[in-house]
Amino acid sequence: MSRLIILLAILLSLDACTEQQPGEILRFDTVIENGMVLDGSGSEAIEVDVFIRAGEIVLIDELDSLSVNNELEIGQRIDASGHIVAPGFIDVHSHGDPLETPAFENFLAQGVTTITLGQDGYSPATENLSQWMNEVEAQGIGVNLAMFVGHGTLRELSGIGRDPIPTAEQMQRMLELLDSNLEVSFGMSTGLEYNPGLNAAEAELLALAEVAGRNNRVIMSHMRNEDDDAIEASLAELIAQGEYARVHVAHMKSVYGRGAARAEELLALMQAARERGYQITADVYPYNASYTGIGIVFPVWAKTQEQFDAALPARREELAEYLRNRVNLRNGPEATLLGTDPYTGKTLADLEQEMNMPFEDILIDIIGPQGASGAYFVMNDELQSRLLEDAYVGVSSDGSPTGFHPRGHGTFAKIIEEYVVKRESLALSEAVRKMTSFAADILGITDRGRVEVGQAADLIMFDPAAVRARATYPEPHELASGFELVLVNGEIAFKDGAGQSQRNGEVLRP
């Protein structure tokens, strides 16, 4: 009965929208027919056809019944029999350089039609983000792009750099830059575990949040410390910014935390904030290893090469002890898998054996704080899986076309393959909601993320049982499979396992 009610409501609303009269010649560029449509709302799939014109969904109806009283002119008909038709996925936290690798085939192959850049506090180093976006548009891009303004970049542009306290003039300049660039971006990102953002005090972050809130934008935060013994304080810092703006926890994790009960404690903190009127959301990726520069294990006073060189003569013993304790706390040297040459594919434990020296000495004498990047197996499956199940937690890849972590090529496929099909811990309709309408709501994107009349025709077609995340840590660049057709703005962008030469993406603006 509920299925019939949903279908009736859709059809009634669409009749009102389209105002088409019997006997008309109805022209459509594309019709996707015979599929089971998940509209992105979390409702169950219904069998209905989707009609597209000029890159937009213009009708949702049954083709056979529509053709009884109308003459139809259809450019192409796509038979989706036996497949799910859903909105294209939206990645709320992505990486990449669209001027260097504009195709973004890694995302298209896993059903992603919109990505977000300018993350972790870093955006293009320009005072006029709109100009850079125009360059991307002129070159063309394979997916849609939503931009963030990076807090760290704002610090650099306003002359603050790594200073802990801005001057009044610097602070005013930073606020002005944020305000002007929020006209074309969807929020501000912070990377408080990285330089220069880690130097920012609460007052600075609150002032920036006030500007973001005034523009109805979101704060997308790589929080100050994701370690299990510090994450409550990091959440509290972000929630305080929620007094002024919507706030979002990027790639939420509890490093070396354990168990579903621990996840419940963290989710309860966020729920308590919502009950006080704050708007706070989060995302996760479905892997138990993070990926970033090796500087993540170095102390705050030795993260840059300059800091490291200055500290080493007097504090070498202290640094060695810090590194030894921190790496062991993060599941030991065998849990750090390096992903950059000449160490690619080797753990710190492997290097210990090869070089016959303690890993802390290898980090100090050979690698240094900026000499490598790697995957860190520091997350607990039970904890992360419980986070994923929460209604206010979405999905991101935190990945890129060129990164050495499988999340950049596999995240969205793995959600379907692992959590929907194998574990059955997420209903397909809920998984799709997290990756479509919920993601759009987090970002403030109003014209994507749903199969509705008036929405952009970013659509995907797949058989859930056939979806595979093929990327692995040894082979992180293997494309996902199972997403047979991906439309971006009404045009085919990915088909039969390959991207198309035409780039159909748009650079989105609020």
Regions of interest found by a model, annotated:
Residues L11-N69, A431, A466-P474:
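N-terminal metal-binding scaffold of metallo-dependent hydrolase/deaminase domains
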Residues G35, F308-D309, P313-A314, R386-Y392, ...:
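C-terminal cap of metal-dependent C-N hydrolases
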Residues V37-D49, G374-Q384, L428-V432, A440-H477:
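Acidic, glycine-enriched loop/beta-strand segments at the rims
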Residues A80-V85, G96, E100-T190, E210, ...:
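Divalent-metal coordination cores built from histidine and acidic residues
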Residues F148-V149, T153, L157, G161-A168, ...:
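Active-site neighborhoods of metal-dependent hydrolases
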Residues S185-E237:
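Divalent metal-binding pocket/active-site signature
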Residues A209-E210, M220-H248, F377-R448, E452-V453, ...:
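Extended hydrophobic/aromatic segments used for targeting, binding, or gating
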